[in-house]
Amino acid sequence: MSRLLIIILTLAITFTTHAFDRENLMKAWSSSVVIRGYTDDGLAYGSGVVVAKDKVVTNCHVLRKTKSPWVSFGDTSFPVTGVQADRWHDLCLLSVFNLPVEPVPLGNSKNLKKGQEIVGIGHSGGAPVALTTGGNIIATYDFEGENIILSSAKFRMGASGSGLFDLKGNLIGITTFKTTGYGNYYSLPADWIKPLMKKEVETVFPINGKALWEEDEDKKPYFLKIAIPKTKKNWAELELVTKEWVEHEPNNTEAWYELGYAYEKLNKVADALVAYDKALEIDQNNSDALLREAVIY
């Protein structure tokens, strides 16, 4: 059997569609709420997900400019009485008085597969009714013991703090930030929510503090360092960054894939194939590396 045929058959298996659980996804949709609060400039808003009785998870950056946030569900508002904050991971858990919303089950980021279908549910633009968007897992990146999720599930302003769900309705991530230029959207792992529940409750707003994705460029993790050169199509710079990445993380399949992509864009085809092969040696289901090899062959 030829190498190209093997690649095509593997890709066909990798991209198999999974069935979705309509009932549990509707429950996930019903768990989405709006976070609001007045600021010096007007009204701030974001999204949140009910993850326990009277507990709503959102992004801390949603709470930076308001002294008195509240939660809206439908046409009813509920006061926020406290918050447990993990500023660096940009996750805040709000205590909400008498919130009549069922919590969603928490999933995890460890078992996610590249290409897996997912659903984003949130309140883009501050819309009172939750909006849904479909997408796929592009990659997961190990960061401080858990996996930050890169997906194609689009979101706009107001969706920060919204939920990313698998097709069974489990919360797998919290939609947080995106990179301009090449349409990739990052979610923080739901795995960080349980440790958040153990933090001390604070009662003073606003919540300030730098988040991981706001780190100085030279201190960012490599999966964020590649964003600017990819956006600017600066393939030589991408080659430099990804060479450093594979040197520091030689067993990272995504690092080798990105190096291969840089080589391919620089017409270093032989080097690209070596890098893609290395990515597949680490993870034989790396569908991006498989696809690029299929294109080359």
Language-model-derived ranges and their functions:
Residues H18-V50, V56, S68, K210-D218, ...:
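N-terminal activation segment of mature serine protease catalytic domains
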Residues A19-L25, E102, L171-L240:
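C-terminal cap/linker of serine protease catalytic domains
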Residues A28-T39, C92-P103, V129-V201:
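Active-site region of chymotrypsin-like
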Residues D41-Y45, A52-A130, G145-I148, M157, ...:
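Conserved active-site neighborhood of the chymotrypsin/trypsin-like protease fold
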Residues K219, T253-E254, S287-D288:
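Helix-start (N-cap) detector for alpha-helical repeat units in TPR-like alpha-solenoids
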Residues K232-V241, K265-K278:
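Structural signature of tandem alpha-helical TPR/SEL1-like repeats
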